[in-house]
Amino acid sequence: MQRPYIESKTFEKADIRDYEDCTFNSCDLSNLNLSGFNFTECEFIRCNMSMAKLSDTTFNEVKFAECKLVALHFEDCNEFLFSVSFDQCQLTLSSFYKRKLKNT
């Protein structure tokens, strides 16, 4: 899969932190600052989000499948509507302190 190439585009006052009903497939999001991002009804498949910053990040009805999620601090996420599910994910050293995990 090739990386998307964006050329001659102007983004002005763009808020690119809100994602709804999106699928992220084989994306490398490791070490990114995802603080304040909002993911609603999204799916991450075979993605690497290891060591990303998640301060006030919203995960609402988000599914992770076969993802590498090492050393994430889910307790830093926005608690309101926090709902995630995991299928065959690597969660080594990730923390869910005081997070309610339904069906997990």
Summary of predicted features, one role per range:
Residues 1-104:
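Tandem repeat scaffolds
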